[in-house]
Design a protein with these regions (language model features):
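Adenosyl-5′-phosphate
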Residues: 1-4, 18, 165, 197-202, ...
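Phosphate/oxyanion-binding loops and surfaces in catalytic or ligand/nucleic-acid-binding neighborhoods
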Residues: 26, 79, 142, 163-166, ...
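Short low-complexity, flexible loop/linker segments enriched in glycine and/or proline
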Residues: 324-328, 350, 372-374, 556-557
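Residues that scaffold the ATP/ADP-binding catalytic core of kinase and kinase-like folds
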Residues: 85, 166, 365-368, 509
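Acceptor-substrate binding/catalytic loop of class I
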Residues: 334-336
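Active-site adenylate/phosphate-handling loop in enzymes that bind or generate adenylated species
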Residues: 139, 343-404, 477, 482, ...
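Hydrophobic alpha-helix feature that most strongly marks membrane-spanning transmembrane helices
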Residues: 183, 249, 303, 328-331, ...
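Cysteine-centered catalytic environments shared across enzyme families
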Residues: 1-330, 342, 346, 534, ...
Length: 601
């Protein structure tokens, strides 16, 4: 795992090094640059050494032909298989790194090589002869990649703070993104909090050549249903999980696992224990409040698998200086209650392991959240009540303003819009009153741009309501909240976190599963729980009520914390500059609207 950055256009060595050094935490083991001012190209790299710790793995790295140069963040787990295929075709390798395999694969097969990669990655390759920059992000968005189109070219980096070191990248705020954040607690889609900084979306690649930019999608998750026995599905899923975990245990440094005691982390740890010849190191965060604490279940799983276990219990006392530093590390506003616990479990792990396996992605893949059942019940109720489509309401709808008319039509006809409303109150919430006189702001909630993360037409054929909900989360919540949080909080600790359940073959298998094998009569993640039964876990452990890793915002609102938070908000710079309305915020505080208060703080 590493930090990458670069530019095409105006720039120099000092700018490139400043960008690179903003990501020292992502790669404290080594650093390098490639700079050709004649062609106006600079690539930077900060290295966290995981595979082949020698200098032969130093980046940026040139291909054997000298035509391509790569700076790369991530891991391609099947690199040895690809390497053997390339060697049969006469390619000679100078190192044992997956970086060189990625570089030579793209040199040999072109962009189609991406389809061979199993893993997580953010890749930048400069082609010297074509004078073309290629940026690639992995299928699920596990690794971040940001870019900005500038006056003279393009700038990119693993983190926004590095991007902003380039003098041609403006720091203007994106008020559209701010409005989205206040509704969903994170910033969805390709936007960021900075108007001229964009995310390269998951499963996309970008080419930049002499001012022309093209962005293409190289992978889609298609939901198709197959009729097979539960045993047949479980056999295939078990094989894929064991294979994915085994591939992610390859490293030249110590490895371990996060263990919450939930279904997903239990699946991952049990698979690791079956594969490993040594006791697996596990790391667990607990809470003093039993409402959120699952450490007793983590201890049960750890003892059952004979692990070497480490525990940390969190008090509901906020280290405000630390939390402000974490928001800086996150690059953008993020009102996720598990931000600090994620940082703390990463910090507790880094002295004992350099690579960690995590169960992230299980809830989105196998319908683990309660919101999926709520949405299913809502959609079933609509059918029972025979709520008509937009055609029946057209005479009323056509009298609405154009922007509201468009949203109402989509709401009636598009289940992704209904899911966004049921989950976030996206269309009924209005934060117009929160903004102060110092901000010339118009709300963008009706703007087409602010809803691009809900456009799912390409996935609709044959999809169920639950599939639609999953796709919304795959396009937004998973990459823009969960995976962004894990990446930033792990990398600030110079720790690589791998997510076996987000192996794309597991995703494609899960997309073929009947909904009833994910959510069955109120039982979420049904097939994963059946797999744990196969692995001899007791039913009272498997079917207990889910608590989740993130405490609610109320957990942090102790009397002492609340006083500091309220003082920060009402006397903070944003209120003084009249960006936010003090009157509105005071009203929300008096109503104990902790969610809004937390978002704003």
């Amino acid at each position: 795992m590493c930090g990458i950055c670069g530019f095409v256009g105006n720039g120099n060595k000092s700018i490139l090094i400043n960008m690179r050094e903003k990501m020292l935490h992502r790669g404290p083991d080594d650093a390098g640059i490639y700079l050709n001012l004649e062609n106006q190209i600079g690539l930077g790299h900060r290295r966290l050494s995981i595979i082949d710790l020698s200098e032969r793995g130093r980046q940026p790295m040139e291909s054997s032909s000298g035509e391509n140069v790569i700076t790369y963040n991530g891991e391609v787990y099947n690199y040895l298989e690809i390497k053997r295929e390339l060697e049969k075709n006469g390619i000679y390798f100078r190192s044992n790194t997956d970086t060189e395999v990625v570089l030579e694969a793209i040199q040999y097969w072109g962009i189609k090589a991406i389809n061979k990669f199993h893993g997580m990655f953010a890749i930048a390759i400069w082609n010297k002869s074509k004078k073309e920059l290629l940026l690639i992000r992995d299928r699920l968005g596990i690794k971040p990649l940001y870019y900005s189109i500038t006056q003279s070219g393009i700038v990119f980096a693993s983190e926004i703070k590095a991007l902003l070191e380039h003098p041609e990248v403006p720091k203007d705020l994106n008020y559209n993104a701010l409005d989205c954040y206040l509704k969903v607690d994170y910033i969805p889609g390709n936007r960021t909090i900075f108007k001229y900084v964009h995310k390269l979306l998951p499963a996309h690649y970008l080419t930049y050549k002499q001012g022309d930019i093209n962005i293409n999608k190289y992978w889609n998750l298609r939901f198709t249903k197959e009729k097979r026995s539960v045993t047949s599905w479980m056999d295939e899923l078990e094989d894929e999980i064991l294979s994915s975990v085994k591939a992610r245990m390859i490293a030249d440094v110590p490895i371990g696992a996060f263990l919450s005691g939930g279904i997903d982390s239990t699946i991952i740890l049990t698979a690791m224990a079956r594969i490993s010849k040594e006791p697996v190191k596990t790391f667990t965060i607990g809470f003093t409040d039993d409402m959120y604490d699952e450490s007793q279940y983590a201890k049960f799983v750890a003892e059952r698998n004979n692990t070497k276990s480490y525990y940390k219990i969190i008090e509901p006392q906020i280290d405000f200086d630390l939390l402000k530093r974490l928001i800086y590390q996150a690059d953008e506003p993020l009102a996720d209650g598990s931000l600090m616990p994620t940082y703390l479990v990463c910090k507790a792990s880094k002295d004992y392991a350099k690579v960690i396996l995590s169960g992230d992605g299980g809830d989105e893949t196998f319908l683990g959240y309660e919101k999926y059942e709520r949405f299913l019940n809502y959609e079933l109720s609509r059918k029972k009540l025979k709520i008509p489509s937009s055609t029946r309401f057209y005479e009323i709808i056509k009298k609405l303003p154009i922007a509201k008319r468009s949203i109402m039509l989509r709401y009636l006809n598009d289940s992704s819009y209904r899911y966004a409303e049921l989950t976030y109150g996206y269309f009924s919430k209005s934060y117009t009153d929160i903004y102060g006189d110092g901000l010339n702001f118009k709300t963008y909630q009706n703007d087409k741009e602010s809803l691009d993360w809900l456009v799912l037409d390409e996935h609709k054929s044959g999809s169920s309501a639950l599939n639609t909900a999953q796709m919304v989360d795959y396009q937004s919540y998973l990459p823009d909240d969960i995976l962004m949080k894990v990446d930033k909080m792990s990398m600030v600790n110079s720790l690589e976190v791998r997510v076996p359940l987000l192996e794309h073959r597991i995703q494609e298998l899960a997309a073929r599963l009947p909904d009833s094998l994910k959510l069955r009569q109120g039982v979420s993640k049904f097939i994963l729980k059946e797999l744990l039964k196969r692995w001899d876990y007791p039913e009272d452990f498997i079917y207990r009520r889910k608590k989740g890793f993130a405490p609610s915002n109320r957990f942090w609102f102790t009397s002492e914390n609340k006083k500091i938070i309220i003082d920060d908000i009402l006397n903070g710079q944003a209120v003084k500059e009249k960006i936010f309305s003090k009157k509105y915020l005071t009203k929300r505080i008096n109503k104990k609207d902790y969610n809004t208060v937390w978002r704003v703080w």
